[in-house]
Amino acid sequence: EMPDAKGAMKFSGTPADCVKMGIRFLKEKGVQIDMVFSGINHGGNLGTDTLYSGTVAAAMEGVICGIPGVAVSVDSHRPSHFETACKLTLDVFEKVKAGIPDGVCLSINVPNLPAEEIKGLKYASLGMRQYIEQFEQTINQQGQTEYWYRGLPVIYNCDEMSNDVTAMQQHYATITPLKFDLTHEQFMQELCKWELKI
């Protein structure tokens, strides 16, 4: 049970698989699905993070199923200002309800700050999110060695580039429209000249 919800289901699996199952079960019950919201995630999904993100994958699964998808993240693994992301998410909900094009997945990233400390909102392209590599070695309960990734984001010169990563560094919230087609169209013609055979 969830407060103020007409109904709720709980699934165990990857975020995208859970969305896939949720959509299936709801459709079987005759429920019209208006949109898929994923999050609010602990930790930003900026730039190249989107390639690894379960939060973005869950929202994208909605898009693949023909349903608008929105991923929401707070740029901290220990967020303390969900209320800031909640307010923006409610505003986005109203815009998505009014309609967005097919195939669009929105990725929202919000600084872990009170609303009054956020400089504003930027509609931003994806940037390069690189990390200073750090791995923590631990021993699990079975006595096996495990490694936990603890990389720290590289800080970029915000004067040289403008994207979601640098906007977050400057304490802006960001919205980025995504699509699932990762094809490098510019290289496709060159690739066809390889004339490979199998």
Model-predicted regions and their roles:
Residues 1-25:
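A cross-family phosphate/adenosyl-ligand binding-site feature
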Residues 14-15, 41-44, 113, 180:
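Short glycine-rich anion-binding loops that position phosphate/pyrophosphate groups of nucleotides
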Residues 22-29, 57-68:
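Alpha-helix C-terminal capping segments
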Residues 34-35:
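Structural motif
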Residues 38-41, 72-73, 108-111, 176:
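Short beta-strand segments
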Residues 44-53:
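Glycine/threonine-rich flexible loop motifs
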Residues 63-85:
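Glycine-rich phosphate/pyrophosphate-binding loops
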Residues 84-198:
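Electrostatically charged, flexible surface regions
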